[in-house]
């Protein structure tokens, strides 16, 4: 078959096009998935039109391989591209068709900045606040925004979004500012942004949700400071939805393009029961391909990063119906209305409406 030494090189080193053989089988994919670069990008930038896929391919392997609209596949391949993945899930689409799209809801997003703005979020950012006089350049922030307010996959497309760029790239070229713990600096940058949003709320800006899709507090040894500022923001009517708040009630789940079933990512397998006890949030659609204006990428192993903006978006939809709803009440309603433990946006909105109407009658 293949030279095992070449496999080892593939798993441990940088992936290059010449490492992709003319004949691709499942065994090769298993080794390729050991490569960090391949796990992140897969075939997203590959021309495979002259390659041949041979043998049987297990869905559990195929769904881990990322690809994009730039990928050129041969006619026969084990990947089933689904154009429905350019859209929100049917439950969210149903809410949008009923005219609930986040009008009047103010959301702040604190994340890695980006230079290129994909068409998915073009015109969707009301305010972009740069950090240290320039923009960061990373795919994370643009994908978070796409899930939140994107034209095709966004949960709450009409919300007013202010983006706070923490620009960690700046410190890569200024290592003297970092010290011994880069994560501590990262946490401090986020904390400073939360204080900034709090002060703006005191001045009447009325941000209702802050979306932070990356872990930070424990790594930066600022747990007490974050707990304090989050509580102060709550006093102004603003809820911070980060990995800590998200994981109290929710977890992330993938959708298999080949058969429409749900599955947990590899990193969740060690705590299967824990994740299945939470309300599951599907977040494995096509997302903007980093560096491209109009191309999209499929990723089969999702994370909290992508599910947090979906929950923030659904909470925003619920706030449009009942502006006094707390995040804790929203989470309880999400559990009560879930379908087979999977979050159901239309069910949430119906329940929020029902509860609001009943409270008015009392």
What function would you assign to each model-found segment?
Residues 111, 236-320, 324:
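Extracellular S/T/G-rich loop segment that most often corresponds to the catalytic His/Ser-adjacent loop
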